[in-house]
C-alpha cells in the first residue's frame, strides 16, 4: 500500500501516514525500514503494510519511495 506522510515528530518518534484510499494510519519510527536515524519528512511518499496494533491499525515495513 502507498501513502504520503501527513506529519512525523522525530523527537517523539511517531506520526501519521495519509492513505490514498482510506483513513490516516499511525506510524512509529521502529516500523521504518532503513539503517541509522529513522525519520520521515512531511509529504514524503512511502510504501507500507498495515497491521493491527494495540490502539488500532498502524503502519509496518515502511519504505521511503
From Swiss-Prot:
<dbReference type="InterPro" id="IPR011129">
    <property type="entry name" value="CSD"/>
</dbReference>
<dbReference type="GO" id="GO:0003677">
    <property type="term" value="F:DNA binding"/>
</dbReference>
<dbReference type="Pfam" id="PF00313">
    <property type="entry name" value="CSD"/>
</dbReference>
<dbReference type="GO" id="GO:0005737">
    <property type="term" value="C:cytoplasm"/>
</dbReference>
<dbReference type="InterPro" id="IPR002059">
    <property type="entry name" value="CSP_DNA-bd"/>
</dbReference>
<keyword id="KW-0804">Transcription</keyword>
<dbReference type="GO" id="GO:0003676">
    <property type="term" value="F:nucleic acid binding"/>
</dbReference>
<dbReference type="InterPro" id="IPR050181">
    <property type="entry name" value="Cold_shock_domain"/>
</dbReference>
<dbReference type="GO" id="GO:0010468">
    <property type="term" value="P:regulation of gene expression"/>
</dbReference>
<keyword id="KW-0963">Cytoplasm</keyword>
<keyword id="KW-0010">Activator</keyword>
<protein>
    <recommendedName>
        <fullName>Cold shock-like protein CspC</fullName>
    </recommendedName>
</protein>
<dbReference type="InterPro" id="IPR012156">
    <property type="entry name" value="Cold_shock_CspA"/>
</dbReference>
<keyword id="KW-0805">Transcription regulation</keyword>
<keyword id="KW-0238">DNA-binding</keyword>
<comment type="subunit">
    <text>Homodimer.</text>
</comment>
<feature type="domain" description="CSD">
    <location>
        <begin position="3"/>
        <end position="62"/>
    </location>
</feature>
<dbReference type="InterPro" id="IPR019844">
    <property type="entry name" value="CSD_CS"/>
</dbReference>
<dbReference type="InterPro" id="IPR012340">
    <property type="entry name" value="NA-bd_OB-fold"/>
</dbReference>
